[in-house]
């Protein structure tokens, strides 16, 4: 809860700044006909005390349409790739913060909070770490040094950090990352302690996918965070990535969020997108609008759910088609940056 007051203050500012209302949203006849009163997702979300964010590819901020939607519709931005290890420390001790700094600058100019993603992850991990042949003590030092430099660089600028990302297999066993196999599970507690020392301001999260419903993996996550809390490890939040499939929002999403909230943690929907088999059609898009609304409603029903980040603005920029051939249309804006029915679904569910 360390940054809660700051985030709330930003939310209040956001709600009061008509200039940040989206011209695009106001011109949308469908939205006018719906009777929605909020001019943007960020206004609607702020009015209900939550943030609404998007992942940003900072290379696309030079596209005015992209930048305008990012600025006007969202109150939080996450670096899609720019704060990951392969970008920030491509070789040992050589740091590159240019993309992250651009994002922080964009966020400060548009009254966004910044969500840091991610300090320790098995993917987008440079070869010098993955294949460095370090022993446990050495790798732990490499990890702590990385956290110290990266979280230290951005200290005071970020509302959240995903300290560790995707530490589990889907069956709830520990993913056999180089950190797990070399250091053991204690690398997770070590990472949180290092992040807390480097940035005492950010809320510190553990983030994963396929943990939205109650299942073996979310049970393992629950057990792990319970144990971290028992050990006094500085953990503040759980991120449910929420890369979902059309028509398959887990019915127990709210119940699952609530059990983490009951541990005293914040819960964040960190990477929401809802993919479908292509081509999209009006029936699928209507279902997608219901699905997005269902996720927002579940978050709104859990006071500890502080916000929702969608993973990218438009279908044009989404990671989905590259990884799931034949699937896509997962975002809230289409390939031409026009809002889809999912936009109204989210807006209405936020109370707009
Ligand atoms: O930067 C290189 C560029 O130099 C090279 O020319 C180009 C050629 O393919 O690749 C570029 O790197 C790509 C990188 O995105 C930056 O654009 C990688 O190939 C590509 O694999 C990478 O994809 C990212 C993916 O994480 C990597 O796992 C996606 O953009 C990003 O949306 C995705 O995000 C993850 C979250 O971090 C964690 N949760 C799952 C989520 C979706 O996979």
Regions found by a protein language model. Give the residues of each.
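Boundary/entry segment of secreted carbohydrate-active catalytic domains
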Residues: 31-80
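Acidic-and-aromatic substrate-binding clefts and catalytic sites of carbohydrate-active enzymes
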Residues: 55-67, 85-98, 168-173, 211-220, ...
């Amino acid at each position: 809860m360390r940054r809660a007051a700051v985030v709330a203050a930003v939310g209040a500012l956001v709600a009061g700044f008509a200039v940040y209302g989206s011209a695009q949203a106001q011109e949308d006849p469908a939205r006018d006909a719906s009777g929605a009163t909020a001019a943007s997702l960020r206004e609607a979300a702020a009015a209900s005390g939550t943030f609404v964010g998007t992942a940003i590819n900072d290379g696309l901020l030079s596209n005015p349409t992209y930048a305008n939607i990012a600025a006007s519709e969202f109150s939080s931005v996450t670096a899609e790739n720019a704060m990951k290890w392969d970008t920030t420390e491509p070789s040992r001790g050589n740091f590159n913060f240019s993309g992250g700094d651009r994002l922080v600058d964009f966020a400060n100019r548009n009254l966004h909070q910044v969500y840091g993603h991610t300090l320790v992850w098995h993917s987008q991990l440079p070869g010098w770490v993955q294949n460095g042949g370090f022993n446990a003590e050495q790798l732990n030092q490499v990890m702590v040094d990385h956290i110290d430099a990266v979280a230290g660089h951005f200290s005071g600028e970020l509302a959240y950090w995903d300290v560790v990302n995707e530490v589990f297999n889907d069956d709830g066993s520990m993913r056999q990352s180089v950190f797990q196999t070399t250091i053991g599970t204690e690398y997770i507690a070590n990472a949180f302690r290092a992040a807390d020392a480097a940035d005492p301001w950010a809320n510190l999260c553990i983030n994963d996918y396929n943990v939205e419903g109650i299942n073996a993996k979310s049970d393992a996550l629950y057990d792990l965070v319970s144990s971290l809390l028992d050990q006094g490890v500085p953990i503040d939040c759980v991120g449910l990535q929420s890369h979902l499939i059309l028509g398959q929002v887990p019915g127990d999403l709210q119940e699952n969020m609530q059990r983490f909230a009951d541990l005293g943690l914040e819960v964040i929907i960190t990477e929401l997108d809802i993919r479908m088999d292509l081509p999209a059609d009006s029936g699928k898009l209507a279902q997608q609008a219901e699905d997005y609304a269902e996720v927002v409603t579940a978050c709104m029903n859990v006071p500890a759910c502080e916000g929702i980040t969608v993973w990218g603005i438009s279908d044009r920029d989404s990671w989905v088609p590259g990884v799931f051939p034949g699937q896509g249309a997962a975002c809230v804006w289409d390939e031409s940056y026009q809002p889809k029915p999912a936009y109204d679904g989210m807006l209405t569910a936020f109370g707009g």
